[in-house]
Amino acid sequence: PTLATKNTISLWFKRSKFDANQQLYTTNNNAANIIFNRSGASTGPTAAFYTNSGQLLGPRLYRDTSAWMHFVFAFDSTQGTAANRFKVYINGVEETSFNNTAYPAQEASQLGVNGQEIQIGTRANYDRIFDGYMAETAFVDGQALDATSFGEFDSDSGIWKPIDISGLTFGNNGFYLEYKGTGTSANSSGIGADTSGNDLHFAVNGFTAADQSTDTCTNNFATLNPLI
């Protein structure tokens, strides 16, 4: 890795259902887990952000299936203040209220290390599958970035929207998935093609080009509300 003590995960997604635990991002050694947790939430799912030495459990309920959302998870274990080692941004705003907190040790190396297997939209044994849409997924190795590196508020609507991140320095083990390809293999023409320049392409499991949609965070379609 460029620097295993500083990393950033950025995820753009829209949910379709919230009736079960669903995984957004997972590593095989539990260095990072981002999950919608249905357990214990009678009226909707909460979001949980884990590493293998820390966790942030949010109190908010996420029940909107009509809007795109953006999560940024910034990890910086070089910080002397424990609360600054994890930062979470949701739709451009830093989340500071959590039900449970636990922070990693200073100088801990957890994300982006060599040999780390990553699953997006599921976890290692292919359960807790995410039900919804994903438009962009990025991992930045060596920098702890805030949400403004990935999005901005629209001057007319005030809605948080993505910006062009192709100019970011992604680091040695960083990747940028735009899901624009059509193949299922881990190569430059596949759905999981890495366009960061690192060629860290992802293979696709249980998904084909026929499952792709033009509903994106810059072209949002109307959907039925399951709460009504």
Predicted regions and their residues:
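Extracellular glycan-recognition modules
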Residues: 1-47, 79-82, 145-148
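Short surface loop/edge beta-strand patches of beta-sandwich-type extracellular domains
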Residues: 1-6, 55-63, 123-126, 161-168
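Short hydrophobic/aromatic patches on beta-strands that form ligand-binding or substrate-lining surfaces
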Residues: 9-17, 71-73, 120, 134-139, ...
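Short, aromatic/His-centered strand-loop micro-motif at the edge of beta-sheets
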Residues: 48-70
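Extracellular glycan-interaction patches encoded by glycine-rich segments
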Residues: 55-57, 110-134
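Short tryptophan-centered beta-strand motifs in secreted/extracellular beta-sheet-rich domains
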Residues: 66-77, 88
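Extended recognition patches within non-cytosolic domains
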Residues: 80-82, 87, 96-102, 133-198, ...
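Predominantly extracellular beta-rich ligand-binding scaffolds that present long acidic/polar faces
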Residues: 96-118
